[in-house]
Structure formats: structure tokens, C-alpha cells
Amino acid sequence: MMKKNILIFVPMIGGGGVEKNLFIIANYLSNHFKTISIISTSKEFKTRFNKNINFISPKNKFWNKIKNRRLKILVCLYLLAKELIFKRNLKVLSFQGNLYCCLICKFFKAKVILRSNASITGWSKGYFKKILYNAISKMADKIIVNSLEFQKEYKKHFNLKTKFIYNPLNKDEIIKNSKKKINFQFYKKQTHNFINIGRLVDQKNQLLILKSFKLLAEKTNYKFKLLIIGSGENKKRLLKFIRKNNLNSSIKVTDFKKNPFPYLKKTNAFILSSIFEGLPNVILEALTLKKLVISSDCPTGPKEILDHGKGGLIFKMNNEFDLYKKIIFFIKNKSKSEKLVRHGYNRLTRFDYQKNLEEYLKILNS
């Protein structure tokens, strides 16, 4: 057991890929370090962590009801400052609010490691913002990114060195959870079944998928079912589009599921339509269950995971016509699609669970 004290900064915990990696990494580290603490406002996720992890959150229940992201970061920064004042020899691993966390840590002369989760192109618009990000990021003791493409972005935009570690993929856990029984009659054997899993926000761009399936309904006689699993601000907009275009019988939107894998197991193909990512876990999960992946060529991650089209179908970002063509290709070319799936599945060895977790251990113990 290593004597260092590790503090993980993550103001808001949701159900996305970042959080899945958080649970895996934190629980692994708790078996190797004397003390692991997590600062977050999301008390409801406390049970997802090992019991020996110290969960630090605001005592007032008021913070559970607040949805404002900046306020949640602010209260967690206050809790972080308190920890840094009263405890010595702390090493901080930041999953969210990286710039703010870095500033606080450097003020108190604490070591901080930033884990960057989303492509620079998605949030670095604006000259001043880039300068500010570059200046603060240089203060960090280390920056971790989760794809080679992501690492190249940091070098190109900021000339910053980063440590590249792929997401640790627990294939056994995914397969185990996919076998849990669900009462789900939406998919039919005689239809082509598709799924999208992700937050219903602009970044994930689910409206593009709906537009492509509208084309499929108008231009072909193929029978299809599309399930979208997720929660977010764009839900009403998506439902309105479905109703307006009479797609209710073919497309279903359902709320976020703690365990989406039984639904993923029942589908034929997974679609990712994002305009930016980091390294989308959900593609790894789809390949683990041997499903064809149809993904946008957004920065960063999808092209790298899918071996630039050898392990899945890639369409031009924000182009519903190209996505439509890829859907048609999948429907018409079963044997070629199966070959893509085999290649994609075999390439999952890059995301080795133990190997990638050990990389985090080395960094935090250095």
C-alpha cells in the first residue's frame, strides 16, 4: 500500500464515459494508495465507489438540487482549498473544471494532474480562451489525454507535452451486464435495429441521426427501429422532430439507463454522431458486444478506435446524407459489415484494462 494521499476532483458525476472511467480508475487506485478522497457534489453516486474511498461533498442538501455547473465547481473549489490548507502531501487528479482546479492547487503549491476528456476543437474557440488555457495548463505537473489524436491536438494548438493513456476497458463487466434480462419489445427480428447512447446535447448531435433515418424512411422500403438512450436539454426537440415526420413507430427515445448493455446487445448497429469527443467509451462497449459501429469522423477518438475505417463505418461529421449512405451500406453488405466488426473487436487489445490502469498508478506514485 503506497503512502501518498490522492485527491480526485470531479464536481459533477453523471452517467457518461468520463464517469465510467472515473469509477474504474478511483476504485483501482483505492487498492494501492493509503488514502483516496473524492470531491464532488454528486452524493448519489457515492455507492459506486469502494467503501475505503473518502467522499467529500457539501453538507447542505441545497447543492443536490442546484443544476448550475459553475456554482457546483465553485463550492467544490472551496472544499478543495480546505483540504489543501489542512492536509499535506496531497496529489490532486482533476477530471473536471481542470483550469480552476489547477489554479487552486498551484496557489497552495500542491501537485496536480489534469485528465483532459474532450477534444480541444470542441471548446477552445476564441483567441483569448486559447491563451488563458495554455498559460494555466503549463502550471500542471502532468496532463493526461486518452487518444493519440488528442495528444497531437495539444502539441499543435498549445505546444504542450501530454501523457497518453487509453481508457481502461473492462470487457468482462460489459459482457456480464449485457446478459441481464430486460422487458423490451421494441426491436423486431424482421427489422434493421440501431441504437445511439449518449447525453441529449448539441455535442452528441442526435438530430443528425434522425434526419438520416427520415431519408431512409422516405427513399427506401427498409424496415428499421432506432433506439436513442439518454437524457438532456435536447430531448423535447428530438421528440418534436420524430412526431412531425411521423417516425413514432420506428424511433424511440428513452431516458438514461444505468445499465444500457442489454439494449446494446439486442441491436444490430451502434451510431455515434458527435461533433467532438475525447475517446468515446461507448464505441469500445459496442465493439465489445460485437456490434457494427457507424461513427462520425469527429475529433478525437472514433477514427483511432475504428482503425480509420477498418473496424467500422465512418461518415463525414454533420453530414446526414453520408450517414444515410453508411446505413444503406450496412443493410446491403452483411458479410463486409461482419468483417469490419471482427477487425474492430480484435483491435480492442489496445485498451487493456490492467495495463492502462497501471499507467495511472505510475504517474500518481512518481
Which sequence ranges carry the predicted segments?
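Carbohydrate-associated surface elements
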Residues: 149, 168
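Short hydrophobic beta-strand element within catalytic cores of glycosyltransferases
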Residues: 292-296
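A conserved mid-protein helix/loop that constitutes part of the nucleotide-sugar donor-binding site
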Residues: 16-24, 192, 196-217, 233-239, ...
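Short acidic/histidine- and often glycine-rich active-site loop of Leloir-type glycosyltransferases
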Residues: 285, 298-309, 313-314
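N-terminal strand-loop element at the rim of the active site
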Residues: 8-68, 150-155, 234
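Aromatic "clamp/platform" in nucleotide-sugar-dependent glycosyltransferases that forms part
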Residues: 256, 275
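Short His-centered aromatic/hydrophobic patch
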Residues: 93-100, 116-117
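Conserved acidic donor-binding segment of nucleotide-sugar-dependent glycosyltransferases
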Residues: 307-320, 329-335, 349
